[in-house]
Amino acid sequence: MAKCMWLALALSLLSLGWGQDACVMDVNCHLPDCNCASTKSPFSDLPPEFTPQFVVLSFDDAVTVTNYGFYLNLLNTFKNPNGCRASMTFFVSHLYNDYAKMNELHRLGSEIAVHSVTHKPDVEHYWRPANYTVWRDEAVDMKEMLKMYGYIPEEDIKGFRAPFLEVGGNDMYQALYDSGFSYDCSWPALQYTNWYGEEPLGALFPYTLDYLSPQDCTVGKCPDGLFPGMWVAPMLDLLDNRGEACAMLDACQGNNTDCADQTCEDNVFNFLKRNFEYNYKGNRAPFGVFTHHSWFVLDEINESTAHTNGYMRFLQYINSLPEVYIVSMNRVLEWMKNPLPAMDLGSHPAFTCPTFDPETNCLDPITCEYREGLPDPGLKEVLMTMCSRPCPTNFPWLGNIEGK
C-alpha cells in the first residue's frame, strides 16, 4: 500500500512538473539541444559499468593567492582513467579575484564560470527581489570582466551560479538565456536524490528547460517558464552526519560516535564516501561536491587537518575506482549532449586532452592598487591582478567594468 502511495506521489510530481505536454526523448525532445528531466542514465538498460560516474568539484568566489595553491595541487594530483588531468569548475566573483591566477587554472583545463560581480551579502533586500535587469547586469558584467581582465574566451564561459543559491525564478533564467549562458547550477534538489525518503525517486541527471521542470524548489524562486536549450545542472543535496540535507559542503555538519561538528577526518571522509556511493552504486547521476575554499581555511583556525585530509582521502578513494571521472560541469553537459559508454569515453571530444598544456595567453600580468572609489566604505585598499594593461583608472565594478 505504501509503495502504491509513493508511486502515486511520484507520478503527481511529474505531472505537476511537466504539465499537459510530457517531455519524451526522441519524440518531442532530441539531443543535443533538448534533454528531458530524468533519473535514468542514457545507458540505464545496460550494466552500471557502461555509465561513467562523473564527480564535479566546484569552488565559489574569487581565485586568490590564498586558495590558488590548493586548487593547483588538486589539478596536479589527480588524473582520470583516460590519462587526462582532473578538471574543476570555478564560479567566480570579482572582488579580490586574481585574474592571472584564474587564467592559469583555465589554461590547465578547468572551467571558469560566473557567480556575479558584487556577491552582495544582503539576500533579503538585493538577491531575493532582484529583477531581470539586476540578474542580467550581474551575470553579463562579470562575464565581460572574465574576458577583459582574465583573457577567458567568451565561448568558454557557459555556466552561472546564483550567490547564496538564491535562485531568481523566470527573471534570472531569462537574463541568462538572453545573455548566452548555456547552463545554471544554482538549484538544489532534495526529493530527486538517491537517498531521500523510504523509496527514493532517484537522482536527477542534467536536463534542459524545453519543458516544465519536475524538480522540487527548496531555495529561492524556481522557474516555471520554458527556456529551450537552457540546461539545469541540479545540485543534488547531500545527507550530512546529522541526517540533514545540504547543497554546499560547507553547510554540511554532524557527528558520528567519536567526533562532533565534523571536525574529525574520518567523519569527513565517511560522509563524502557515503553520499558518493548513493550515486555510484545507484543510477550514476553526476555527483557534485560544491564548496568554498573557506571551508578548508577552518582547518587552520581550528588547528586541525580534518577537512583537508578527509577531502583528499575521499578524492584518492574515488580516483582508484573504475569509470570515475573528476571533471568540470561543462564536460558533464557535453557528455549529456552526446553520451558515450565509459569504455569509449576517451574518444569523446570533451574528454580528450593535449599532450602538452597550451601556452599561456596571460604573458605580462599587472597588479593594480585602488584606495579610492571602492564599492564598500569599509575597504581601505584592493589589489587587482589582471592580464591586460594598463590599469583601469578606477576600480572596475558593476555598471563600470572598464573602471572609467
Where are these regions (language model features)?
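Low-complexity, serine/threonine/proline-enriched polar segments
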Residues: L204-S213, G229, D364-C391
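C-terminal regions of proteins
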Residues: M329-P354, P365-C368, E372
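Cleavable N-terminal signal peptides of Sec/SRP-targeted secreted and luminal proteins
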Residues: K3-G19
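Active-site beta->alpha N-cap acidic-glycine motif
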Residues: Q20-A113, T118-D122, Y132, K143-G150, ...
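Aromatic-lined glycan-binding groove of carbohydrate-active enzymes
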Residues: A203-N279, G288
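Short low-complexity, flexible loop/linker segments enriched in glycine and/or proline
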Residues: W127-N131, E198-T208, P341-M343
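Glycine-rich phosphate-binding "P-loop"
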Residues: V123-E138
